Amino acid sequence: MGKLILDEIVKATGGSILSRARCEFAGLSTDSRTIREGELFLALKGPTFDGHEFLGDALAKGAGGMVHRLPSADFHGKTLIRVDDTLEALHDIARYLRGKCTVPVIAVTGTNGKTTTKELIASIFGQGMKVLKTRGNLNNHIGLPLCLAGMDGDEEVMVLEMGSNAEGDIRVLCDIARPDFAVVTNVGLAHLEGFGSIETVRKTDLEILDYAKTACVNADDRFLLEGVREFKGKVITYGIQNDADVRAVDIAPGERGSSFGLCLPGKKEVGIHLPLPGRFNILNALAAAAIADECGIATASIKQGFESFRGVPMRLEIKEFRGVLIISDVYNANPASVEEAIRELLRLRKKRTVVVLGDMLELGSYSGKAHREIVRRMSQAGIDIFIAVGPEMTAAAAEFTGDCYTAEDSFSAGAVLSEIWREGDTVLIKGSRGMKMEKVLDAVPAVMEGENAL
């Protein structure tokens, strides 16, 4: 992490120096629990927390100074900067640091696949370049500016993930990051409590086009493509089903990944082994290949970036336990991602299929209908056993025609699963982040005891 300079922070934020001791800081932190010696502590205030209550804790752990909104603060011998709004100050600092950079910035947004696509892009560029990338899925109005504030200054490319919950969110992030390249993975039904409609989801994701010069979009998502028609910059398409600039051909899916021919514009087809299962991960890979090719990355680096990739935790992880094949896709869920996961379950099935499915949260007035439709489709697909987790899935469970169980929470669902699964089963575990579906496996006694750990 590069050093932060006091005078630059004041210039960026318009803040007032209440006391001056240290003029350089080892980095920026908003968490008093993890702050490191010499870092600048920025006290954020949220709905359930106020960083100003932990100023003393931050200093006790070696913070080199503080940015806060208090009229005064009694911390003698420390650098104190007062601002009117600490969140805006965080944005201002990140915007200022971004403005000092001339390296290309690639931003990734969309309903599904953002994190995996971002990591695949970073893996490709990382074969020969220093990459700054969003940590995990810290893709919001706090995580993204913190990522930018962590620049060393010698990065050669930035790969930033942008998430949204309401209209205008992507615009806020783009105003900070100023992306040169935009990747939009798809548009689907998610966070409808904030958006209200899928049209608003698309409108919000495509706010990114007001900033980027080049857009890379999924040609298999016709609804997304319709929204890009008026874009005045360069559009690169990728896809499997439809004509696109970047395509995958001769796809050979396997249990632990897929092989396919990668077709890039004007280049010879190259064979790829992607160590990620699922058709949607091929689309994520095509997005990464498209943007890398546009940036002049060699095909050999694209191939190496894919084949050295090791996946993203809690996203379509394949595990085996006592003859049971487990698909753990527990990070999040919405109707489109659930359908894709079920498709993968059916492809990998051996004998019985078991779906442990938690509520899909934040769907607003569409929630009841969405849950019922998913359950009906599972019945039509011939799923053998359904364990419904949470009130929404439980309410929709009446639509299921196979063997059905209900559970209040993920841990209870795991107890049910441990009673009914048997050798040869293929099990899918999925649900929204708030359902904490990773706890399903914690309830299996052998796992809890550490026997043959998954």
Model-derived regions, located:
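N-terminal leader/targeting and accessory segments in enzymes
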Residues: 1-92, 247, 277, 347-348, ...
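Acidic, Mg2+-coordinating active-site environments of NTP-dependent enzymes
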Residues: 8, 12, 68-77, 183-325, ...
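Phosphate-binding loop of NTP-binding sites
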Residues: 8-10, 89-215, 219, 225-234, ...
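Mobile, glycine- and charge-enriched loop segments
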Residues: 34-41, 149-157, 180-182, 342-364
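Active-site beta-alpha connecting loops in nucleotide-dependent enzymes
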Residues: 46-48, 312, 330-406, 432, ...
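Short beta-strands and strand-loop turn motifs
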Residues: 103-109, 183-188, 218, 285, ...
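ATP-dependent carboxylate/acyl-activation modules
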Residues: 108, 313-315, 434-440
